[in-house]
């Protein structure tokens, strides 16, 4: 783990609320929100739209604690480069508000609480998956890949794809092909998401020596790979409809619509790979895309939604049958 660099000046907390705020910031709550949304999507799909509110609360809480633990350890490890990068230098550790040792104790406490909560109130599989997410994010991505491989995001993206597996396991006690497809969707979504950001802040990554794809291969190659991953991603999302049959018509239509917008934005970046505004637009949309895709999964999985689509399908078949009878 990296120690906070020496010229980071300590800052005192003036009250207990500032202490809570600093430790809260260590968990990177904005990242956790998206992870919890994918967890919920996994739960609803796995339970076919009928999820216990208590189990939902327990699983999301356990997932949030596990993600917070991983993020806090990441903050410890990256405190040296966080101080250099403009957007991260005021994080709790590089700014001196939290000591690395205290952050580690905090992270381990979160992880232990998460494991206990998920084991007792969900099941052991969900708990072990949550812990594997911490190990992969810290050990494989943060320690091994981030500063040493241009494929850091491609391989490391698996850590961010574990939450839907946790959600699915919490409600079913097992992992089906559909659960692994959710995992694969997020793995493939991750490179376009992060590489768009990397184009936007390429100079910062270059300054601290992180080998992101735009730094090593340039913006044009990065935009090309974003385009390829996007073209793979969109058809993958429709595999939930066929052949897996875990999502229906509403999901198919809206997932296609969201995907078309994603493709359009990736195409715009391909045509103008050095345009930071276009890269930033794609990065922001990729977040909305994943949130909305998961929301559509949840809506489509609800029992009353299936009732509506079934009624519409029956009405359409009746209409077509009547029209054919009149014509022939």
UniProtKB/Swiss-Prot annotation:
GO terms for cellular component: plasma membrane. One of its GO terms (molecular function) is protoheme IX farnesyltransferase activity. PROSITE patterns: UBIA. InterPro entries: Protohaem_IX_farnesylTrfase, UbiA_prenyltransferase, UbiA_prenylTrfase_CS, UbiA_sf. It comes from the Bacteria. Pathway: Porphyrin-containing compound metabolism; heme O biosynthesis; heme O from protoheme: step 1/1. Keywords: Cell inner membrane, Cell membrane, Heme biosynthesis, Membrane, Transferase, Transmembrane, Transmembrane helix. It is a multi-pass membrane protein. The chain crosses the membrane at residues 31-51, 53-73, 120-140, 153-173, 181-201, 226-246, 250-270, 285-305. Carbon 2 of the heme B porphyrin ring is defined according to the Fischer nomenclature. Converts heme B (protoheme IX) to heme O by substitution of the vinyl group on carbon 2 of heme B porphyrin ring with a hydroxyethyl farnesyl side group. Belongs to the UbiA prenyltransferase family. Protoheme IX farnesyltransferase subfamily. PANTHER family: 4-HYDROXYBENZOATE SOLANESYLTRANSFERASE, PROTOHEME IX FARNESYLTRANSFERASE, MITOCHONDRIAL. NCBIfam families: cyoE_ctaB, PRK04375.1-2. This is Protoheme IX farnesyltransferase.
């Amino acid at each position: 783990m990296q120690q906070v660099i020496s010229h980071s000046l300590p800052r005192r907390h003036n009250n207990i609320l500032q202490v809570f705020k600093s430790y809260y910031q260590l968990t990177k709550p904005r990242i956790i929100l998206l992870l919890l949304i994918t967890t919920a999507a996994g739960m609803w799909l796995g339970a076919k739209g009928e999820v216990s509110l208590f189990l939902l609360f327990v699983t999301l809480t356990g997932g949030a604690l596990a993600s917070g633990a991983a993020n806090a350890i990441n903050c410890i490890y990256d405190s040296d480069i966080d101080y250099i990068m403009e957007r991260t230098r005021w994080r709790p550790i590089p700014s001196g508000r939290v000591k690395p040792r205290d952050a580690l104790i905090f992270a381990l406490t979160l992880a232990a609480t998460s494991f206990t909560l998920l084991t007792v109130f969900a099941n052991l599989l969900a708990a072990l998956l949550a812990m594997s997410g911490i190990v992969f994010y810290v050990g494989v991505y943060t320690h091994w890949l981030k500063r040493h491989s241009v494929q850091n995001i491609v391989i490391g993206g698996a850590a961010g794809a574990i939450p839907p597996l946790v959600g699915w396991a919490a409600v079913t006690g097992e992992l089906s092909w559909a659960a692994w497809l959710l995992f694969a969707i997020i793995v493939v979504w991750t490179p376009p998401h992060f590489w768009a950001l990397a184009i936007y802040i390429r100079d910062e990554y270059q300054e601290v020596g992180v080998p992101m794809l735009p730094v090593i291969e340039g913006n044009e190659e990065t935009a090309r790979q974003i385009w390829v991953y996007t073209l793979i991603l969109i058809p993958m999302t429709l595999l939930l409809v066929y052949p897996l049959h875990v999502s229906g018509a509403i999901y198919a239509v809206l997932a296609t619509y969201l995907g078309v917008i994603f493709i359009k934005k990736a195409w715009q970046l391909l045509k103008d790979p050095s345009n930071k505004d276009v890269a930033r637009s794609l990065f922001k949309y990729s977040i909305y895309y994943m949130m909305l895709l998961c929301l559509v999964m949840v809506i489509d999985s609800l029992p009353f939604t299936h009732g509506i689509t079934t009624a519409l399908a029956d009405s359409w078949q009746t209409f077509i049958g009547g029209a054919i009878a009149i014509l022939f």
